[in-house]
Amino acid sequence: LLSTVMRETLFRGQAACRPLIAKRGLSDSFVDPALRFLEGRGTDFSLNNRLRGLNIEDGRVVGLDFGDRPAALDDGDTVVLAVPPLAAAGLVPGLEVPGEFRAIVNGHFRLERKIEGFSFLGLSGGLGQWLFVRGGVASVTVSAADDLAEEDNASIAGRLWADVALALGLGDVPLPSHRIVKEKRATFAQTPEQEKRRPGARTGLKNLFLAGDWTTTGLPAT
């Protein structure tokens, strides 16, 4: 995985190493435009309905079980299953998926003033790893944070804010309004054993395909 990342970035020169930052968040940059694109082409959306099962006949998916709202499929329909790995394993018979995961912890802090001309910074020597500033909010990320995720939010906030204040040159500023977000299954554990468990996009069912960073993309999940 590391060699692929290096070939796609460092070995291709500075133009391939320039990070892109979403100005107003990932929803504004990716999700909302995608929804508008699909809506403009007559796509129907059904949100907040958990997929409970796949109806399978003769090696293909013929229906989707949403509980009280089943959906039958036509002969030419294709299903793209973009759900977390454990959910996919519960839906697709015989599907092997990564079963070990790593946590990510994020801290978001309200700044007293906007920091002009600053977007993001890699941190070294502290707890935080990446620092992003958008508007009046500073966000700091810690990956592979399994142990940290078990700590209480107050302790995490204090430690991360110390990194933020130092990196931004804020001095001895009291802990501001903040939010700590823990995602205990943020990525699968990218070990050799778990890498072997990543499935491809194609499945044993003719019209069912998988999507997700936990599939065999050739790249890390983060």
Please place each PLM-identified region on the residue numbering.
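Glycine-rich phosphate/pyrophosphate-binding beta-alpha loops
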Residues: 145-146, 214-222
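Short, intrinsically disordered, charge-balanced linker/junction segments flanking boundaries
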Residues: 42, 88-91, 219-222
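A structural signal for the hydrophobic beta-strands that form the central parallel beta-sheet
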Residues: 45-47, 81, 210
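Active-site/ligand-binding neighborhood in enzyme catalytic cores
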Residues: 1-57, 75
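FAD-binding beta-loop-beta segment adjacent to the flavin cofactor pocket
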Residues: 129-133, 183-210, 214-217
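Short coil-to-beta-strand
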Residues: 2-7, 135-138, 203-209
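Conserved beta-strand segments of alpha/beta enzyme cores
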Residues: 44, 174-177, 207
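Mid-domain catalytic core of redox enzymes
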Residues: 49-181, 200-202
